[in-house]
Amino acid sequence: AFKMATGTGKTVVMAMVIVWSYLHRRLVPGSTLADNFLIVAPNVIVFERLERDFANNKVFYDLPLIPPELAGQWGMKLILRGDSAIPDPSGNLFVVNIQQIYESREEEWTAVNAIDAILGRPPKQDLASYQPSMLERIKSLGNLMVLNDEAHHVHDDDLAWNQTLLAIHENLQQKQGHGLTAWLDFSATPKTQTGTYYPWIIVDYPLAQAIEDQIVKAPLIVHRVGKEDPKRVVTDNVVQVYNEWIVVALE
């Protein structure tokens, strides 16, 4: 897990890991790293932020992260939430919010008689028009690395997020003899549901260090002198009531 304070560049680190793994797979004989990647956001708001960064492979070229002499090796196909594109053999980057994988799960199938039990699930009725779900496309990949954004939402055996990723891992084990290539968690607070930090943290970049390194701004502590707390605060007047506090914070 990567424990990084908010605003210190988790997205940049994700992009660096992806470039390193992808090019290693392409250039190093016998590499066991990934050339397929799944970035998972906890909700649509976080997904939209990731979408802005990764759309059209923007983040990889803006920083820049891809060495010019290796640009010809880069062939990553980007598949965003809602895309129906089929994965490419040259490598893929899926960026989704976890709810989309929930919604696209294959329906459970149970044999209704002995013949069904022997023959298994019947094929799709119209293969020509059939569109594989996001989950089906992800399960079809090999050499898959998962990167969880805001990963404090993930690790609880009862959480659907955790169960979904474990199901993908187990599916890969059954099909290819090995599961996920890597599972990386990114969060400012990578804690379990009981409040303890993940024992697999390998990077710890706290807010105090980020402030000292001038990566983020130092917090401003405002001391009130002779100022009473606002009263009768409602939704319609909250901006007006707290106007002085807002102005001070912005300045």
Tell me what each language-model feature is.
Residues 1-251:
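RecA-like P-loop NTPase motor core of helicase/translocase proteins
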